[in-house]
């Protein structure tokens, strides 16, 4: 079997051959119309102001923060909604992905050089447990895997890129696709691939979000001026499919819906899990295309809407509408890829 299809082609192939997940074209149209009023104002510069935990700089240190966080950006969902890992920082308790960011910032404030490759290449499991400790009785999931990835990733960054993710970014020649390939080729934990209907496919959720966050932290300038940023798709995790189902743009079969409502686990690489992720990516591509059509028809000046900005907005929308979405199940998969 040859190299995997790209995330976009993987998504198209999965959507065309999916049995339990369907992209609803009328729902896509309605979702685009719902998002339209906000879409014209989306800008890469908003990433830093989007959340108080994101780094404010656009330098090597900020890139080091982004690389560390995206290397650990997986599996934050709680077994029970009323019992979650939370990290208190600056007087505020954070859950999910933001608990990770809060723990990193807490460690940096305490003088622990957690974003330095020479530190996390040799950090012990005990130190990792302490750095990412929860302020509730519920620990952050997959702590052993996080420790292993920190050691592995740190060693590779030191050996191949002089300990700096900036060197990796500069090798990409300002290409989002080249940077994604460099990440996937050099760092094994980013190889988010599967087999589906006889083809090798790839979603590369963390590699793509690392490219997107690099673009965002550098505000699309200098080393982060990726002309091909629109080739990056949405990041196939467990929250985005939930919001797409809530918006009516994605539909599940009765069999799959029953399984998800019961809280049954789906293994990474299972056919239904692949269908959920692939169809979600394709759904967002279609919403983006529809948004661009609507914006072109409007009075607005041309706007660059890409799947990265759309993903950021949908993810925030999901957090804002968490209560409304309680009846929509998310798929439960424990893995290091998302």
Swiss-Prot record:
Catalytic reactions of this protein: queuosine 5'-phosphate + H2O = queuine + D-ribose 5-phosphate
Pfam families according to UniProt: Q_salvage (PF10343)
Keyword S-adenosyl-L-methionine part of the UniProt annotation: no
Tissues in which the UniProt entry reports expression: Highly expressed in liver.
Organism, scientific name: Mus musculus (Mouse)
Official protein name in the record: Queuosine 5'-phosphate N-glycosylase/hydrolase
Active site: residue positions: 237
Disulfide bonds: none
A molecular function (GO) term: hydrolase activity
């Amino acid at each position: 079997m040859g190299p995997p299809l790209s995330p976009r082609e993987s998504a198209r192939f999965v959507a065309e051959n999916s049995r339990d997940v369907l992209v609803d074209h009328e729902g896509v149209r309605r979702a685009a119309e719902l998002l339209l009023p906000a879409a014209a104002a989306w800008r890469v510069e908003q990433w830093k102001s989007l959340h108080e935990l994101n780094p404010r700089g656009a330098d090597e240190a900020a890139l080091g923060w982004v690389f560390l966080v995206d290397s650990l950006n997986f599996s934050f969902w709680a077994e029970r909604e009323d019992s979650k890992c939370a990290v208190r920082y600056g007087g505020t308790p954070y859950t999910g992905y933001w608990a990770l960011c809060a723990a990193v910032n807490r460690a940096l404030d305490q003088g622990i050089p957690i974003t330095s490759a020479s530190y996390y290449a040799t950090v012990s499991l005990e130190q990792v447990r302490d750095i990412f400790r929860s302020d509730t009785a519920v620990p952050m999931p997959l702590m052993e895997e996080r420790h292993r990835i920190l050691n592995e990733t740190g060693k590779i960054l030191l050996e191949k890129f002089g300990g700096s993710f900036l060197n990796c970014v500069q090798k990409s020649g300002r290409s989002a696709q080249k940077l994604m390939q460099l990440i996937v080729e050099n760092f094994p934990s980013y190889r988010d691939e599967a087999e589906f209907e006889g083809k090798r496919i790839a979603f590369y959720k963390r590699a793509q979000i690392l490219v997107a966050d690099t673009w965002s932290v550098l505000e699309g300038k200098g080393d982060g001026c990726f002309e091909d940023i629109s080739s990056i798709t949405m990041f196939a995790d467990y929250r985005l499919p939930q919001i797409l189902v809530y918006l009516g743009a994605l539909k599940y079969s009765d069999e799959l819906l029953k399984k998800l409502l019961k809280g049954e686990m789906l293994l990474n690489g299972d056919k239904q899990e692949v269908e959920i992720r692939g169809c979600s990516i394709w759904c967002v591509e279609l919403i983006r295309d529809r948004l661009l059509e609507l914006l072109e028809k409007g009075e607005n000046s041309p706007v660059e809407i890409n799947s990265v900005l759309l993903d950021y907005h949908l993810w925030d929308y999901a957090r804002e509408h968490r209560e409304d979405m309680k009846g929509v199940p998310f798929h439960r998969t424990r893995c290091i890829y998302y």
